[in-house]
UniProtKB/Swiss-Prot annotation:
Top-level taxon of origin: Eukaryota
PROSITE patterns given in the database record: CADHERIN_1 (PS00232), CADHERIN_2 (PS50268)
Example of a GO biological process term: homophilic cell adhesion via plasma membrane adhesion molecules
Complex formation: Forms homodimers in trans (molecules expressed by two different cells). Forms promiscuous heterodimers in cis (at the plasma membrane of the same cell) with other protocadherins. Interacts with FYN.
Tissue-level expression: Detected in brain throughout embryonic development. Detected in adult brain, in particular in cerebellum and forebrain.
Keywords of the record: Calcium, Cell adhesion, Cell membrane, Disulfide bond, Glycoprotein, Membrane, Metal-binding, Repeat, Signal, Transmembrane, Transmembrane helix
Classification via SUPFAM superfamilies: Cadherin-like
Name of protein: Protocadherin alpha-4
Cleavable signal peptide: 1-29
Spans of repeat PXXP: 734-737, 774-777, 796-799, 829-832, 870-873, 888-891
Membrane-traversing stretches: 698-718
Annotated region (6 X 4 AA repeats of P-X-X-P), positions in chain: 734-891
Organism field: Mus musculus
Amino acid sequence: MEFSWGSGQESQRLLLSFLLLAIWEAGNSQIHYSIPEEAKHGTFVGRIAQDLGLELTELVPRLFRVASKDRGDLLEVNLQNGILFVNSRIDREELCGRSAECSIHLEVIVDRPLQVFHVEVEVRDINDNPPRFPTTQKNLFIAESRPLDTWFPLEGASDADIGINAVLTYRLSPNDYFSLEKPSNDERVKGLGLVLRKSLDREETPEIILVLTVTDGGKPELTGSVQLLITVLDANDNAPVFDRSLYTVKLPENVPNGTLVVKVNASDLDEGVNGDIMYSFSTDISPNVKYKFHIDPVSGEIIVKGYIDFEECKSYEILIEGIDKGQLPLSGHCKVIVQVEDINDNVPELEFKSLSLPIRENSPVGTVIALISVSDRDTGVNGQVTCSLTSHVPFKLVSTFKNYYSLVLDSALDRETTADYKVVVTARDGGSPSLWATASVSVEVADVNDNAPVFAQPEYTVFVKENNPPGAHIFTVSAMDADAQENALVSYSLVERRVGERLLSSYVSVHAESGKVFALQPLDHEELELLRFQVSARDAGVPALGSNVTLQVFVLDENDNAPTLLEPEAGVSGGIVSRLVSRSVGAGHVVAKVRAVDADSGYNAWLSYELQSSEGNSRSLFRVGLYTGEISTTRILDEADSPRQRLLVLVKDHGDPAMIVTATVLVSLVENGPVPKAPSRVSTSVTHSEASLVDVNVYLIIAICAVSSLLVLTLLLYTALRCSTVPSESVCGPPKPVMVCSSAVGSWSYSQQRRQRVCSGEYPPKTDLMAFSPSLSDSRDREDQLQSAEDSSGKPRQPNPDWRYSASLRAGMHSSVHLEEAGILRAGPGGPDQQWPTVSSATPEPEAGEVSPPVGAGVNSNSWTFKYGPGNPKQSGPGELPDKFIIPGSPAIISIRQEPANNQIDKSDFITFGKKEETKKKKKKKKGNKTQEKKEKGNSTTDNSDQ
C-alpha cells in the first residue's frame, strides 16, 4: 500500500509539470506592432487584449499589467478597452541611437492563472534630425607662404537619422582661393577637405570667410552649415618703421623718477610675432643715458629713472632701435633728443672764510670779522644771489667784490650786555619762486677789563661787641665784577692808614679771596667806640681796576668795668671813709657820701648803692640813697648807739652780670656836736619821698619795659621804611663832631672830660667824641657851664613845650648814616625817639625849660633839674652830622655837636645837670669860646694819655 501511494504521488507530480510547461509555452508566444517615432500622446498602437485572446472583463480581476525592460512609461494599456497606446514622446535616436533596428520589448503579465506574453513594438525612423557640424564656426590658420594645391582637411557633419535620412551632400560657398574636395566611395581614407587654388597674401587678404553647407536625403531635406574662418598667417617679410625718425623733447630738470619723456612708436606690416616690435636703446648709446632713462620694450615709453640736472648735462641724445620677433628679426631706428630746461632748483651756497674770532669788546667800528663767499649753480636770474643779515646785531655786510661779502662791526660791543651773538646770513637768489639758504656763525665777544668791582652798598655799618676773641669774623664784604675770567677775579685788601698811634692792620684784616673781615685783637669800647676804614676790591685784569667800600664798625659796650670808688679826700685810700657825727643830729642828716664812677656806658655805668651792715643794728641807724650814695641817719641818735659804726656800702652797676665794689665808711659818734639845721618840714618831706621811692620804682620799671617794647616795634617799622634811603654823606666827615656824655651821681659834681677817637677810613682822624661826667666843682662852676651853653647863641633859648622827659635818655637823630641795620634809633629834629617818665613828687613844678631826670639814672630826683637852651634844634642839612644818636643796648645819649668849618662857635644844644636854682645868662665873646675849646682839647689829650 505504501508503494502504491507513493506511485500515485509521483504521477500527480508529472501531470502538474506538463501542465505548467504547456502554459509557459503558450505565454511565450510574441505579438509585433510598429509605430513611427515622435508619435503623439494617445496614439493607437494595437488591441493587445484582443490579440492575446483575453476578455476585457478578465483584465482587472486577473491583474493585467505591462512591464518593460527599457522604459515602461513610453506605452500604456487601457484596461477598459484593452488598447495599447503611446503614453510619452518616443525618440528613436534617443532610444536606439544609430542602430538600424529599434524596438520596444514589453511583457504582459496576468494572474489566475499566471500567464506571461511578449510584445515587440518597432519604432520607425523619420527625418527629424538635420545634419550637424561639430561647431558652427571653424577657424583655419594657413600661412601665406603655403604652396598651391595644398589640401587642408575638414571635419564632416553628422546626422542622427539612419538610412536615406542620413545620406549627406556638401557644397562650398564660391571663392577665389579654395575648392571643396568631397570623398567618394573609393576614397574614404582621404575624406573631406579644402584645396588651395590661389596664392595667399596676408598683407592683401589677411582673412577669408567661407560657408560649408550639408544636406541629408530625407523628405523633406534638412540642411546644416559651418562657417570657415581662414586666417592667413604672416611671414616675416616687413621691417618695423618708426613714425618719426627724430623726436625732440624738452624736459625740466629735477623731474621725479617715472616721469614720461616721450613715447616712440614703430609699425610692422607683418603680424603676430613678425609684427611684434621690441624697443631698446642702441648698443652704442652712452652709459649716462642708460643711467638716466629707461625705455619700455613693449610700449616704447621712455621714462626718467635717474636725477636730471641741468647743471650736469643740458641735453641728451638717445638712439632707439625697434626689432620684430620674427624667425629672422628685422629692425628699424630713430633718434630722440632730450633738451633739459633749467629751473631754480639750486639754493645759494655760503661759506665763511677767514674768521677772526673771538672779537674783543673794544674793537673799533669797521673791524672785519669774517669773509663770506656765495655761489649758485643755477644760471641767469636763478643764479643771481643777494645776501642779508639778521636784524638787531651790531654787524653789517659789505660787498667787497663779486660773490664775496665782508662781515664787519657796525657798532660798539659790550660783553657785559651781550657775551655772544648768533649771526645768521641769508643768501637769496633771483628765481621765481626764489630759493634761499642760511649760514650762521657764533661771534663770541672777548672780555676787556673795563668794569671795576662794584659793592652792593657804598658803606656798611657793623656792630661788634667789645672784648671779642682775636681773629673773630665780624663782617664779609662782597664785590661783583661784570667782567669775565681773570678780569672778574676780585681780591680784597685794607686801605691802610693810622688809627691813632697804630696802623689799621693791627686792628682788622680782610681775607683776600672771601672778603671776610676779622678783628685781630679784642676791641675795647672804652678805648675805641667807632672804627671807620675802607676795604679795597681789585680785579686781576691788566690794568687792574678797583673800588673801595667804607665800613663803620661800632664797638658795643659790655659790662667789663667794675665801678671805681672816688677818693674825695687826700690821704684816704682803699675805699675807707671816716666821718665824725654828733649825737645830737636828727633823722635825715647826711653823714657821708660814697662816690663812684664806671668806665662803661649806658646801663653798664648806671650805679646803685646798697648799705650792708657789718655789725650790730647799724642798718637801722643809717641808710644810703639808692642812686645818690648819700648816707644819712634814719632816726635821732641816742646814748645806746655804739660810738663807732662800721658801714659797708655796696656799689653795683646794672650790667649783666652786675659788677660790685664795696666801700667802707667808719662813722664815729661824738658828744655835743653841732646840731644840723634841717627843717622839720624838709625832713618829713624827705622821709616820705624815700618811703615812696620803692613803689615808684616798681611802676617805673613796668613803664620802661612797656616803652622799650613799643620802641623796638617802632624801630622795626621805621627801619623798613628808611632801608632804601641812600646816605648823602658819611658820619665821619671833615668837620669835628663833639660827643658829650652827661651824667650825674648825686648832689656832688664829678667832671671828667674824656676825648675818644672815632676812627674813619676816608679822612684823617679828625673826629673827637667828648664824654662829660658831672663836675667836681661847686654850683658856681655848673652855673658857668650852663651859661656857656646858653650864651653860645647870644640870646636866651626858649623852652620846648613838648619836652617833658629826661633829656639824658632822649635823643634825636637826623643823619645820612645808615644805622637802621643795627637798630639805631633815629628821628627828625625835635621828635623824641625815646621818652622816659620823671619823678617830681619831692620837688615843686619845674620851671619852664626844666625837667627832672628819670629815677634810677644816677640823678637825685629831689634836687636835680635839667635846663636846656631855647627853641627847637636846627634842622640838619645834607651832609651834616646828627646832633644826637643812641647806640642800641646803651641808655646813654651821645650828643654830637658839629661845628662849622669857618666858625668854631658851639651853637648846638648842651646838656648838663645841676641843683635846682635860677640860671644865669651870660654872653661870651668868640675869643673866649676859642680859648675854652683849646682848654678842652688839652684836657682830652691829657685824658687819652692817662688811659
